[in-house]
Amino acid sequence: SLDITVRAAGAIAEHYATRGERVSLATFGGRVAHAVPPASGRAQLRRVLDRMARIQPGGTGGPSAAGRLAVRQSSGSRMTVLLSPLISPEVLDQAVSLGRRGMAVVVIDTLPDHVIDHDDDLTAIAWRIRLLERRREIRMVNGAGIPVVRWRGPGSLDQVIRDIARRTTGPRLVRR
C-alpha cells in the first residue's frame, strides 16, 4: 500500500504543481517525518517527489508529529488530500476534524485489492473483520460530507474535485 500511496501522491502533486497551484507534503505516519512547505512549479514537484522517495514503511502506524502539525496548521483556503490505506481510523478522524473546520477535504483510499489473499485462515478472517469495521468508518466520514475515493489512477479524483470546486463557491458553515 505504501507504493500505491506514494504513486498517488506523486500524480496529485504533479497535477497541481505543474499548473501553478501551491503544493505541500506532510507525512502522517511512518518512521521519519517528511515535510515540504507549500510552493508551486516544477522545482516544487521535484522536492515533493524527492522527499517521497525517502519514505520508509513501518513505524507505529500512528500520526507523525509533522503530520499532526500539518493538519492543525492547514487553512480553510486549501484543499487537503489525505492518502492512506485506511487500516487505522486515525486518518479518517483527522479528515472529519478538518471538515468540521470548514476545509475542503478528500480522502484517497490506497488499500490494494489483494489485501485479504492469505493462506492462513485466521489472518484472512482478521482482515475480513477489519475491513468490515473500515467500511463502517468510511460511511461515517462520507456522512460528514467528506468524500473517500478509491485510487484507480490519475483520473480517480476528477469528479470529486469538480464537486468540491462547486461546493467552495457557496456559503459554508464552520463549527468552532
Please place each PLM-identified region on the residue numbering.
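Exposed, interaction-prone extracellular/peripheral surfaces
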Residues: 1-176
